[in-house]
């Protein structure tokens, strides 16, 4: 049998190239669709507090304020993003991958504030039972929560009187929510560390217990061993990066929580800069900065605690690092929104993981009279490559 060489005609060759280009184009578009991350970020929901004034009413409970915010979140996916040169500008949001809340679920139980048990039940009602958020594929959005200083103090005690003296309900609730296969009925801060990670569309999310102190960094080091240096990493914690001395373990005496020293023992690391709260946190922050220098793929730090919207850069005590920081408002204790309810805000974070562009948009969720209407506020674009 004689073999013949096959030489495709010009028409056949052109058609084949067209099919190949169409396939490559469709594949690229499919990958592009998968490269988008959308998540909502809020913090300091403080169940147990009341708001002096909200939507024409006085002394409005956190349950009602937070429920109003949740209603706006639930309808956000149908909204069109503004023409602001950000990721997905002028396009419908379409889906929310996750709702992230960085702590202070329950307010500290001082001066007649309700118990953490009551606050956790209200949290479940608002952010679990009334949560209708879903991803672009129709599946339910993840709810990702870490504790704040109020949650931890309710569980371990405080240097001022509380009633009751301890109630770990929100710490137990957060732990069981995030570790459903290892549920607990009591809480021990030395055993039940609330830290975990998630991989979402090519980004590694790390969720921390209050602050990345030396103990958290040991766990983070192990977690990051499985992550490529080219994978962007986001950190989520309650505390500001320039952490306050009171968060650390009391360096004095038997290292307990007491009225004289007023350290809160919120993280395991013992305070080193001084013996009282008048000191700095230079040593503690430098430990974190060194960790950042060892892991340059840590790109963004999300936090609450100080309760206003700000997108800024953390430089460290020696001005030798540059970490993008996203600070968010509190629906109950906002430094700005407390006086002007139209400034109440949460953040919508959108990233294209192929281009490496991250867009953060402030959602002014109470700026209009409609119960589910909002205005866009601050906006920032970051290139993470």
Predicted regions and their residues:
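N-terminal active-site segment of His-dependent metallophosphoesterases
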Residues: 28-115
């Amino acid at each position: 049998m004689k073999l013949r060489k096959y030489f495709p005609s010009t028409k056949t060759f052109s058609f084949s190239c067209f099919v190949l280009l169409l396939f490559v184009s469709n594949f690229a578009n499919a990958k592009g669709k998968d490269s988008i991350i959308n998540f909502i970020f809020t913090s300091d929901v403080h169940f147990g507090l009341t708001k002096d004034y909200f939507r024409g009413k006085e002394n409005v409970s956190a349950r009602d304020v937070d429920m109003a915010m949740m209603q706006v979140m639930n309808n956000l996916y149908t909204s069109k993003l503004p023409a602001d040169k950000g990721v997905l500008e002028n396009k419908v949001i379409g889906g929310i991958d996750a709702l992230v809340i960085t702590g202070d679920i329950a307010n500290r139980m001082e001066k007649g504030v309700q118990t953490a048990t009551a606050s956790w039940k209200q949290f479940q009602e608002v952010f679990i039972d009334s949560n209708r958020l879903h991803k672009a594929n129709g599946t339910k959005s993840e709810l990702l929560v870490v504790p704040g200083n109020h949650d931890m103090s309710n569980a371990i005690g405080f240097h001022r009187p509380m009633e009751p003296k301890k109630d770990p309900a929100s710490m137990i609730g957060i732990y069981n929510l995030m570790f459903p296969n290892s549920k607990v009925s009591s809480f021990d801060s030395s055993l039940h560390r609330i830290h975990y990670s998630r991989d979402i569309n090519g980004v590694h999310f790390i969720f921390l217990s209050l602050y990345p102190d030396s103990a958290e960094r040991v766990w983070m080091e192990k977690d990051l061993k499985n992550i490529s240096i080219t994978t962007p990493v986001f950190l989520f914690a309650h505390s500001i990066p320039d952490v306050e001395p009171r968060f650390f373990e009391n360096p004095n005496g038997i290292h307990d929580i007491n009225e004289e020293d007023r350290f809160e023992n919120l993280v395991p690391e013992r305070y080193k800069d001084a013996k009282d709260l008048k000191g700095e946190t230079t040593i503690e922050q430098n430990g974190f900065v060194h960790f950042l220098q060892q892991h340059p793929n840590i790109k963004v730090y999300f936090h609450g605690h100080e309760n206003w919207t700000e997108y800024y850069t953390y430089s460290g005590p020696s001005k030798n690092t540059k970490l993008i920081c996203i600070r968010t408002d509190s629906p109950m204790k906002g430094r700005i929104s407390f006086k002007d309810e139209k400034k109440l805000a949460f953040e919508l974070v959108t990233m294209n993981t192929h281009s490496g562009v991250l867009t953060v948009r402030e959602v002014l969720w109470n700026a209009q009279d409609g119960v589910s209407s909002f205005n866009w506020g601050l906006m920032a674009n970051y290139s993470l490559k």
